[in-house]
Design a protein with these regions (language model features):
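Proline-aspartate-enriched helix->loop->beta-strand connector
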Residues: 207-208
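Structured, hydrophobic secondary-structure cores that serve as assembly/anchoring elements
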Residues: 215-218
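Metallocofactor- and cofactor-centric catalytic cores in central/energy metabolism, strongly enriched
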Residues: 3-166, 172-196, 221
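Internal alpha/beta domain cores that form substrate/cofactor-binding pockets in large enzymes
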Residues: 189-195, 202, 220-239, 243-249
Length: 253
């Protein structure tokens, strides 16, 4: 788990951006109050468009993070933890009696500064894809979100995804963590139908016993969440969803 991170900051890119409380009661609700943060203050040139500004800030953060990573490449780490996955066929042989479980991660892809990138490709332009869970630890998924920060996943959270870590802890003990499936949350119904159909098809092809689905964002992506859940369950696969509780304690929303 990374304890240091690069934070890009500056003039607002999109409304509803977030702040990090390093002390006080708010600090208990963010992991970033406990990390060592190198903050980059980025000032936009006059007249720059929002999407150009977001991309420039995002790539500036990448360059600094890569530079810091290179400085630490030859250092001896304080702790080493091994996460190991096997091939699908090998997993069947190694764990024949354990339930086959996959993690379906829905990625924000609504545009208008609600974007996520997979190996540099805008998630809006992708189809549901199988990944090895260790790929996300190496930065396969990065965030381009600048709106509703409390309900979006920054790159740090993708790299340290708690669902992936928890599934690895149970891998080979109570379950066989087969793979991770990523899918998008596009705004048009045709895209939602296509992606949810494809996600359910992949789950069926992998002969899964159980699936955990996590959602990013709220509102429009709620549709994607339920479509994914219903279609995966229609294939006879036990499905659990992870979503957010908004506004009211009785979950009326």
């Amino acid at each position: 788990v990374y304890k240091r991170q690069v934070v890009t900051a500056g003039r607002i890119v999109g409304f509803q951006e977030g702040i990090i409380d390093m002390t006080g009661p708010g600090a208990d609700y963010t992991p970033f109050s406990k990390t060592l943060n190198l903050v980059m203050v980025c000032e936009p040139v006059e007249g720059i468009k929002q999407h150009e500004y977001e991309k420039a800030v995002r790539f500036a953060g990448f360059r600094v993070a890569a530079y810091i990573g290179e400085l630490a490449r030859e250092l001896t780490p304080d702790e080493i933890k091994v996460y190991e996955t096997c091939g699908i066929k090998e997993g069947i042989t190694q764990y024949p009696d354990l339930p086959r479980v996959a993690y379906v991660q829905m990625l924000q892809s609504q545009g208008l500064l609600h974007d996520t990138y997979v190996y540099g490709v805008d998630a809006k332009k992708t189809l549901p894809t199988i990944l090895s869970p260790t790929e996300i630890m190496d930065g396969a998924i990065v965030s381009g979100n600048c709106v509703s920060a409390c309900d979006k996943n920054p790159t740090y959270v993708h790299e340290n995804n708690p669902v992936v870590h928890d599934l690895f802890e149970e891998h080979g003990k109570t379950l066989n963590f087969v793979c991770q499936i990523i899918t998008n949350e596009n705004v048009y119904l045709a895209d939602k139908e296509r992606s949810s159909d494809w996600t359910a098809k992949l789950c069926k092809m992998l002969d899964l016993d159980g699936v955990i689905v996590s959602q990013e964002g709220f509102g429009n992506p709620d549709t994607d969440l339920i479509m994914n859940c219903k279609k995966i369950e229609a294939e006879g696969i036990k499905t659990v969803i992870i979503t957010c509780l908004l506004y009211t304690s009785d979950a009326a929303d």
